[in-house]
């Protein structure tokens, strides 16, 4: 994965996630729109097989980079939780 910041202001962030698909972007978007600091979160992928998605975040004034970092941390926590639950189920 390669992430390029296309634009950033105090409350907006637009990033291109090279090589990513709907899988990661849907998870990020869903977590971001549940965050009370986020006013708008969406991504655009013009052509699924040949274009890289662009994620857009607008916050209430909170640093959008911190908001995106928090969403990434939540994904890691959810994956860790799934790994634990899955391991217990398999070993039961």
Curated annotation (Swiss-Prot):
Keywords: Cytoplasm, DNA-directed RNA polymerase, Nucleotidyltransferase, Transcription, Transferase. GO terms for molecular function: DNA binding; DNA-directed RNA polymerase activity; protein dimerization activity. Transmembrane segments: none annotated. Its main location: cytoplasm. It is found in: Cytoplasm. SUPFAM superfamilies: RBP11-like subunits of RNA polymerase (SSF55257). Its EC number is 2.7.7.6. It comes from the Archaea. Part of the RNA polymerase complex. Belongs to the archaeal Rpo11/eukaryotic RPB11/RPC19 RNA polymerase subunit family. HAMAP family: RNApol_arch_Rpo11 (MF_00261). This is DNA-directed RNA polymerase subunit Rpo11. It comes from Methanosarcina barkeri (strain Fusaro / DSM 804). The lineage of its organism: Archaea, Methanobacteriati, Methanobacteriota, Stenosarchaea group, Methanomicrobia. The gene is rpo11.
